[in-house]
Each structure stands twice: as structure tokens, then as C-alpha cells.
């Protein structure tokens, strides 16, 4: 069963082009039986959960947090894990997440480190029973040990044509005038 692991929706303000209703429709059309969202807040979780359940899709609830400038993606295993995600999300609205926060709210969570954050693996391994390093390309995979390795690529749009709008979205987020956004 294929389930994309790192999907951000437009609930991660000015980071993604994906609307939950479009994501559900895409999953239905492509016979995807499980979906995850990994926004940087928990705002869209109920809408996502209800839409998945109404369409016979298994919802996987995740949260992207930042610690020491590195991204960490956490997934709830059950309701206790979900509550821990809510606590971490709340903390992240007030201040930066610390290692101590993660040690307090680590139970019933799966931790996947995006490739650029794999340096945190040894620091976080004692906290998580299920912790994985990720890669996006074959070249990246070759640089990592084979233990606890998963493929994970951040998904920020559904339709390829929407990718051209992302630099403008990010520019707005960074306070850059649209006319000054550099598009590659």
C-alpha cells in the first residue's frame, strides 16, 4: 500500500498549495488508501480526519516541528500520540521546541527525520522507539546507513502546474514583494 508520508496542506500557512478537499479527491481518483498530513500546526486535522473517514481512506496524523533549525516529522500511533502532537503544536506556537519537550511528549509517536535533519538521529534515538532517517534520491540513500531508512519527499502541490506558484507563496511568507520574487 502506497501512502505519501510528508504532505503539507495550505494549513501550513504560505508553505503549500494543497487544499484538503483536493487531496482527498486526488487520493480517491488514484486509489490511495492511506493519507498523511504533516502540517506545522494541527489546524486542519479534524477536517482531514473527517474527510478521510467519509471516503474510506486511512488518515495518518502528523506534525512537522522545528528544533535547533532542523525539521522533525512526528506521527501519532494512537489517541495518546495524537494528544502529544497537540501539546507539541501548542508549545511551538509559543516558543521553539526543545529536546526536553520532546522527551516529555514522545510516547506513542513515530519520528521521521527529513534528509537535511538526519544529523539529529543519534540525539533523538533514545527518545523514540520508532525513529527513521529519510532520503529523497538514490544519491542521498547511498550516503546513509541502511538501518531505519525510509523514502520521504515533501509534497507541497498536487498538480505540477501549481509548483510555479510556490516561489511567490514563499516570497510572501518571507515579506518579499511579488515583483522581487526570483523564480528558477
Q: What are these model-predicted stretches?
A:
Residues 1-184:
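Phosphodiester-processing cores and adjacent nucleic acid-binding clamps
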Amino acid at each position: 500500500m502506497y501512502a505519501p508520508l510528508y504532505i503539507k496542506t495550505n494549513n501550513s500557512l504560505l508553505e503549500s498549495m494543497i487544499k484538503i478537499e483536493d487531496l482527498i479527491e486526488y487520493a480517491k481518483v488514484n486509489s490511495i488508501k492511506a493519507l498523511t498530513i504533516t502540517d506545522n500546526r494541527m489546524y486542519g486535522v479534524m477536517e482531514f480526519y473527517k474527510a478521510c473517514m467519509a471516503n474510506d481512506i486511512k488518515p495518518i496524523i502528523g506534525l512537522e516541528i522545528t528544533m535547533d533549525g532542523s525539521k522533525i516529522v512526528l506521527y501519532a500511533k494512537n489517541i495518546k500520540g495524537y494528544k502529544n502532537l497537540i501539546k507539541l503544536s501548542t508549545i511551538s506556537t509559543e516558543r521553539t521546541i526543545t529536546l526536553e519537550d520532546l522527551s516529555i511528549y514522545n510516547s506513542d509517536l513515530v519520528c521521521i527525520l527529513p534528509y537535511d535533519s538526519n544529523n539529529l538521529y543519534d540525539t533523538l534515538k533514545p527518545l523514540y522507539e520508532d525513529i527513521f532517517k529519510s532520503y529523497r534520491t538514490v544519491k542521498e540513500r547511498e550516503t546513509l546507513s541502511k538501518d531505519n531508512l525510509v523514502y520521504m519527499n515533501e509534497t507541497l502541490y498536487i498538480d505540477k502546474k501549481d509548483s510555479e506558484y510556490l516561489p511567490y507563496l514563499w516570497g510572501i511568507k518571507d515579506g518579499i514583494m511579488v515583483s522581487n520574487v526570483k523564480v528558477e
